[in-house]
Structures are given as structure tokens and as C-alpha cells.
Amino acid sequence: MVSRLRCFIGGILFCFFTSSFALHATENDDLVKAMMEVYAEELAANPQDYRTYYSRAMAYFGQGDMKKALSDINNAIKYFPRKEKDDLAQAYLLRAKILSERGEAKSALTDLNSALRLVPNHRLALKDRGDLLCRLGQYDMAKIDYNHLLRMDTRSQSAFMGLARVEAHT
């Protein structure tokens, strides 16, 4: 219980760190170091703790360390219970973002497809896949995702903006 609480507190600290009310830079360094120590302790005690891997991957992503973020999200996905479809879809989304940042668009697309197989109406996955398909020049496929998103939410600004991008290129 104590370790879960420490991990939860680490997550709260990370959220505070990344918020617009962030501390001064030197205090941020100490906060990140403390948070990473908590994650390391958690993983030393439970090397298959997928939630801690996920949280630390988010922290590394926030710091711009894509190599470590990718390693941790790979472990999170490896250990995630397959029955936790919503959370597993979120893990695939994070890995897609990491891969996209690394310039691995096709691998990112594979992960977005995996997230949508788990949760077919996942709005963020549809938006992200539409955006990625636009970047890859696959405008017809992107249009399908944006229209799907628009059917789910008739006021979706992401869908409208995506469709406008598609129209500008076709």
C-alpha cells in the first residue's frame, strides 16, 4: 500500500511539474529526480508493475527522453493485462506519440491501429491517426477517421480542423 501511495504521489508531482504553475527550474530538477527515484524503487520491488512503467514513460516523454520513454512504454505494454482495454489503448497511444516524435510514423500508425482495435470509438486515437495519416499524405484514410470522429461528436473542433487540412490537400 505504501509503495502504491508513493507512486501515486510521484504521479501528482509529475502533473504539478508539467502544469503551467511549474516550479523554478532548480526545484524542477529536484522534483524530477525524486520522482524518478520513486519509480525506480517501485520497479525494483515489482519489475512487472505496468502502471509504474507507464507513469515513468510519461515522465520521460515529458522530459523529451524518447529512448527511455520508449523502453518503459514497451515494458508497460508487455505487462499490461489484456482485459484492461481502455488503459492498454492509452499505452498504445503514448507509444504512438513517442514513435512519432522519433520519426517512426509507420510504427506509430501500427500502434494507433492497435488502440482502435481495443477501443474502436476512442476519440483521441481517431484524431491522432487522422493527423498522422495527413502527415503521411493518406488524405482519404484521414478523412474517414475525421468523419468517424464527427459522427461521434458533431462539434469536434479536431474533426473540423482535420477535414479542413484534408480539403486543403485534395
Give the residues covered by each predicted segment.
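Canonical tetratricopeptide repeat
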Residues: S55, D87-Q90, L94, D128, ...
